[in-house]
């Protein structure tokens, strides 16, 4: 399994080159494989993105939060290291499984980890000294700790390319007018030589290992496209206003030349692998290259570099088991590692944020092997002090400063950058409360930083705290640079308050000021949509798509217009195109469901509703639509009632969360306590969840696992619970709700919260009988233990869990026996209500108990 990373690669530059026959190796790859867009993550900073690619996890979980990190020894900043990563990368997972792997030039890999295989870190290719012929290593000593095994360091040092080794003829492949002297004196050409030398060194290190060492996985990361694009994309045709005719003529061919170089390197790599190797090529984001480029310079120091990054990069797959000549849709950076695991016939961990790109596979089995996690106590970092070369670290920090990625080398500045980046991760993944915490800490250090003020305002808006949001906007009222974003946010505040006309006026003023963008045009379109001005809305969505054809929000809005104007087939197509670009948008799936209903595609509409409910488990809207469809289009009264009840509970919970301050004399709200239902599998936990929900406590569930013969009323599970050990963010809004957690996951609960645990007990033999029946129905064998051994294992688990619970000061426990609940539902409902301390509907709770479901009751002797 080979993964080739091309930082910043974009189909919009690649496709014209392929059409002209200038990237023949990639064309052959695509003809025999599949291709698609891949959605990036926020913030678009390479170390964070490539670590997400290598782990399948968001940055708040993998821990790499930028280009630099504080050095605990010196108190200064240093380039980000492998010790920052808090979870397993794919090469660590394979090492734990005894399978060899290799990684070349990946971000945050120095010092080299001691894996089963080989590592060439992101510091190996950096030229830290002058080239001096005749001296050891030509006066350019290799970086300690940059290669594993260490005995390969001298061998690989011989394949490095120093910038002084890049000849004028090689420069002229990209800049034909360059003279010999200019290649050594012109700052722009000297920068190009440095970047080409780095790229060549990475490629040489990769090819040195490719056919010489065994590997089941190899990751090669080329950063040249992105780095050279920041230096030269502003010269790409068509000529930008700030570029002179002379500079345009001189540098206009650089970027296409860089892509041709990568095609040649791809051809060499493909010759060194066999037909049994699957290959993924991907980028971490795209790069604007045409008339959609932002104003100003593309350089990192002089311009706004992230503005040049496009939301969608490229991904392509080739090899055994991969379809030929097909397209894939909805991929994200988080999907690469799960896909690699699947292609290597290894389970995909349920605590990963991504999913395998099975749409690229020729065949997909009925079931996909999974495991809870690959996280364990093993570490592959070098023992003792991490090897760090002061010269290399200094050179990298100087380069990062010169490029504008970081400020000075003071650790405080880096820590503030990490707060910003972590806050951006939280905000972009729908966790505004956590984002607010990070950016408030930024403002504690830099009270006048308007960018942080605006982000705090955005977080407050998402949380519904409109007055606090406006207070933050007032702080940037005199900043002309912040004015457009502040005006847009004020418009959204007015929209939240129901003043759609006032919001529209602000947006129209923004457009008339000469600041239109796809996002702004789309926002105006949605505002007109809410006001039922469909012609105006359609016009704005079309304008947004003319500017950016791959805008998922504009496509979604256009689909709504189509549906509401009687064009259901066109609406379905628009929503599907939106989802193909960015899959995790629950509202788009809901809009698709409505369009499918208008097109009389009821089964597909139900599927789309379920996806929306799964993606947004606290939103009542998908359940309301499901209830309506089951009642009026399917004729299933039981399922309609189930979803109607679920929607009512979720809407009541939402209302409680948004209520104002409590009046004197009113009962205490639920606050932060979470009610947890736990017990062994098949002990009856779903029944307890039904009782609590019937009583008025909202149940946290994503409806991912549907009802079946074993649980006719549903399983009441939340998939995110399984990842609690590495991501407990689902608890942020779980206060006042009930959730089902198996006993094995209780210890993963963070200790800074209050929990009410309802521990369901049931006769072990009944549990074993129920499990056996379920396994038989599913055609599975279960554990390789006899009944007596299983009984002992379960009894020991119960004993250990109960012992652990007695020592947790933040957990209250109520033990409930399943048999008693079935026999005396009213009595157990009263006990539950007293334990929870709520004014629950005990009659409804008792009514949720169906004695007919007690099918494995133990016969009395």
Positions of predicted regions on the chain:
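Metal-dependent active-site segment of extracytoplasmic phospho-/sulfohydrolases and closely related
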Residues: 3, 25, 257-298, 340
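PAPS-dependent sulfotransferase catalytic core
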Residues: 41, 112, 116-123, 662-737, ...
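His/Asp/Glu-rich, glycine-adjacent segments
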Residues: 57-245
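Substrate-binding rim/cap in mid-to-C-terminal beta-strand-loop elements of soluble/periplasmic
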Residues: 267, 298-346
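Histidine-centered active-site microenvironments of extracellular/periplasmic hydrolases
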Residues: 278-320, 353, 369-371
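Single-residue signature of alpha-solenoid repeat helices
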Residues: 435, 469, 503, 537, ...
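PAPS-dependent sulfotransferase catalytic domain
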Residues: 613, 738-841
């Amino acid at each position: 399994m080979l993964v080739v990373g091309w930082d910043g690669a974009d189909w919009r530059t690649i496709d014209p080159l392929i059409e002209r026959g200038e990237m023949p190796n990639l064309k052959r790859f695509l003809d025999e494989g599949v291709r698609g867009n891949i959605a990036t993550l926020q913030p678009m900073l390479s170390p964070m993105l490539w670590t997400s690619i290598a782990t399948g996890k968001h940055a708040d979980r993998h821990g790499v939060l930028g280009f630099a990190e504080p050095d605990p020894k010196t108190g200064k900043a240093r380039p980000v290291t492998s010790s920052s990563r808090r979870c397993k990368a794919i090469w660590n997972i394979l090492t734990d499984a005894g399978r060899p792997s290799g990684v070349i030039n990946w971000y945050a890999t120095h010092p080299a980890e001691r894996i089963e295989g080989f590592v060439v870190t992101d510091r190996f290719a950096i030229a830290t000294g002058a080239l001096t012929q005749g001296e050891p290593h030509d006066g350019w000593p290799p970086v300690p700790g940059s290669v594993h095994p260490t005995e390969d360091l001298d061998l690989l040092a011989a394949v490095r390319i120093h910038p002084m080794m890049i000849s004028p003829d090689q420069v002229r492949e990209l800049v034909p007018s360059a003279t010999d002297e200019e290649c050594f004196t012109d700052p722009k050409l000297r920068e190009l030589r440095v970047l080409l030398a780095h790229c060549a060194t990475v490629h040489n290190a990769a090819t040195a290992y490719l056919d010489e060492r065994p590997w089941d996985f190899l990751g090669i990361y080329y950063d040249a496209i992105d780095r050279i694009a920041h230096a030269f994309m502003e010269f790409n045709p068509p000529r930008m206003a700030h570029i002179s005719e002379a500079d345009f003529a001189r540098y206009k061919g650089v970027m296409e030349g860089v892509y041709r170089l990568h095609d040649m390197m791809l051809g060499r790599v493909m010759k060194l692998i066999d037909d049994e190797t699957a290959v993924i090529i991907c980028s971490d984001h795209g790069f604007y290259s045409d008339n959609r480029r932002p104003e100003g310079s593309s350089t990192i120091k002089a311009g706004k570099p992230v503005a040049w990054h496009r939301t969608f990069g490229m991904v392509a797959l080739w090899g055994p088991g991969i379809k030929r000549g097909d397209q894939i849709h909805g991929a994200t950076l988080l999907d690469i590692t799960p896909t690699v695991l699947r292609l290597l016939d290894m389970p995909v961990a349920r605590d990963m944020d991504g999913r395998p790109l099975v749409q690229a596979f020729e065949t997909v089995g009925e079931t996909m092997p999974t495991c809870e996690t690959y996280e364990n106590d093993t570490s592959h970092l070098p023992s003792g002090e991490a090897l760090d070369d002061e010269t290399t670290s200094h050179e990298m920090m100087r380069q990062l400063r010169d490029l504008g990625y970081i400020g000075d080398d003071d650790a405080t500045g880096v820590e503030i950058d990490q707060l910003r980046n972590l806050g951006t991760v939280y905000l972009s993944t729908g966790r505004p409360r956590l984002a607010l915490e990070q950016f408030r800490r930024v403002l504690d250090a830099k009270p006048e930083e308007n960018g942080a003020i605006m982000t705090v305002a955005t977080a407050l808006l998402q949380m519904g705290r409109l007055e606090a949001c406006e207070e933050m906007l007032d702080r940037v009222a005199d900043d002309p640079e912040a004015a457009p974003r502040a005006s847009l946010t004020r418009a959204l505040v007015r929209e939240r308050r129901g003043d759609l006309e006032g919001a529209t006026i602000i947006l129209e003023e923004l457009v008339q000021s000469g600041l239109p963008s796809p996002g702004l045009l789309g926002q105006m379109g949605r505002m007109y949509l809410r006001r039922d001005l469909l012609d105006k809305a359609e016009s704005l969505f079309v304008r947004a798509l003319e500017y950016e054809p791959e805008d998922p929000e504009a496509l979604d809005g256009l689909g709504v217009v189509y549906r509401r104007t009687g064009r259901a087939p066109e609406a379905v197509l628009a929503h599907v195109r939106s989802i193909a670009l960015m899959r995790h948008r629950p509202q788009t799936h809901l809009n698709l469901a409505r369009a499918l209903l208008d097109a009389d595609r009821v089964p597909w509409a139900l599927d789309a509703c379920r996806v929306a409910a799964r993606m947004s488990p606290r939103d009542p809207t998908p359940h309301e639509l499901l209830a309506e469809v089951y009642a009026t289009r399917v004729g299933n009264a039981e399922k309609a009632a189930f979803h109607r009840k679920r929607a009512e509970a979720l809407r009541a919970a939402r209302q409680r969360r948004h209520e104002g301050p409590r009046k004197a004399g009113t009962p205490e709200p639920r606050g932060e306590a979470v009610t947890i239902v736990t017990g062994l599998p098949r002990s009856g936990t779903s029944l307890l969840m039904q009782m609590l929900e019937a009583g008025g406590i909202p149940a946290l569930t994503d409806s991912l696992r549907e009802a079946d013969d074993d649980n006719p009323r549903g399983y009441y599970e939340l998939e995110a619970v399984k990842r609690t050990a590495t991501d407990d963010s689902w608890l942020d809004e779980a206060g006042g709700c009930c959730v089902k957690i198996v006993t094995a996951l209780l210890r993963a609960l963070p200790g800074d919260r209050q929990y009410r645990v309802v521990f369901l007990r049931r006769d072990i033999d009944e549990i074993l009988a129920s499990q056996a029946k379920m396994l038989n129905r599913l055609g599975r064998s279960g554990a390789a233990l006899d009944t007596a051994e299983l009984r002992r294992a379960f009894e020991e688990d119960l004993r250990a869990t109960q012992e652990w619970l007695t020592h947790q000061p933040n957990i209250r426990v109520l033990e409930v026996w399943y048999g008693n609940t079935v026999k005396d539902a009213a009595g157990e409902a009263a006990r539950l209500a007293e334990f929870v301390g709520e004014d629950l509907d005990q009659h409804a709770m008792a009514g949720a108990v169906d004695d007919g479901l007690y099918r494995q009751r133990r016969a009395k002797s």
